[in-house]
């Protein structure tokens, strides 16, 4: 499983997920590919993640669904999105969020064009 944690996700979640699933590739956008994607628009990040077969982890329900809808209208796929709610997973709950991400990743095999909300 390959994950990209977007800028809204605490960077420490990457290491916490890797402790649970050491065979996965988990990157934070601030350091992924030398940090070049840190300030990139969501549509470009979705393109790059799709090319890399990397699922995006985000709490950004304000703009990301719009980009996904636009991609779909253009016939473009995405590699999947794991959404989470900050009320359920506050920034200080890194371990709890990491466990939920790992659990969702183990339960689901096909991520293409899907999104899952962590509970």
Stretches with model-predicted labels:
Residues 4-6, 55-61:
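Acidic beta-strand-to-loop metal/phosphate-binding motif
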